[in-house]
Amino acid sequence: MIIVLSPAKSLDYDTPAHVPSYTKPAFVDDASELIDGLRKLSPQDIATLMDISDPLARLNFQRYADWSPTFSPANAKQAVLAFNGDVYEGFDAKSLSAADLDYAQQHVRVLSGLYGLLRPLDLLQPYRLEMGTRFANARGKDLYAFWGDRITRALNEQLETRSGVARVLVNCASTEYFKSVKPKLLAAPVVTPVFEDWKGGRYKIISFHAKRARGLMARYIVENRIAEPAALKDFALEDYAFDAAASNDSTYVYRRRIGE
């Protein structure tokens, strides 16, 4: 079983990493190619391309200038400890044991506009480049064209090493990021957990809650060493419960109703 997550825009490079071990990203050469293109942009170009404020654009202009193809703890931090958004509040990697992080290293992957596909302990230099950014490059009009089937092939390599267990990809990523994966080329079926909250007289996806819940699901899989999709139906953290009637073989729906 492989779990894929989206990255986070918010990053934490202030809190010291609680584990010393780290690995190097697989697609450094590809990331370097993107950085070369990003370095040609002015801060105003970046602000327009990414629809961000001028201060954020200047910050990322400097990040691209500082980025190096050589990774070390001096200029980078393990991805799962550097990302700091809603998903990663749910996953809460800083409280995982060394054994849990080792398991996550084998089973969790983070999709990234710049780095393609990251393992939890892959070193990450600070950046901003969302997968949906229409950044024209030598391979096409956007990042989906840039990555092509590279991410899918990398996932297949990892799925194909899973002998004796169910080969399945659990999609805990956003739609924007999962578009970088080509399900028809995957060597495994996809199961997508969907989290809905009761609001305004019906169940709906509330972004903040859904992101956090996807992180909780990834942590649940890691801590419980889940290997079969059926076991995902037992997930019941923070009052979510599996709804069989709303689910099917590829979409597992979890709902909660707190108050009225």
Swiss-Prot record:
Native organism is: Burkholderia ambifaria (strain ATCC BAA-244 / DSM 16087 / CCUG 44356 / LMG 19182 / AMMD) (Burkholderia cepacia (strain AMMD))
Which cysteine-cysteine pairs are annotated as disulfide bonds in the entry? none
Q: What is this protein called?
A: UPF0246 protein Bamb_2261
Pfam families found in the cross-reference section = H2O2_YaaD
Query: What Gene Ontology terms for biological process does this UniProt record contain?
Result: response to hydroperoxide
Q: To which protein family does this belong?
A: Belongs to the UPF0246 family.
Highest taxon, organism lineage: Bacteria
Q: InterPro entries recorded for this chain?
A: YaaA (IPR005583)
Cellular compartments per GO CC = cytosol
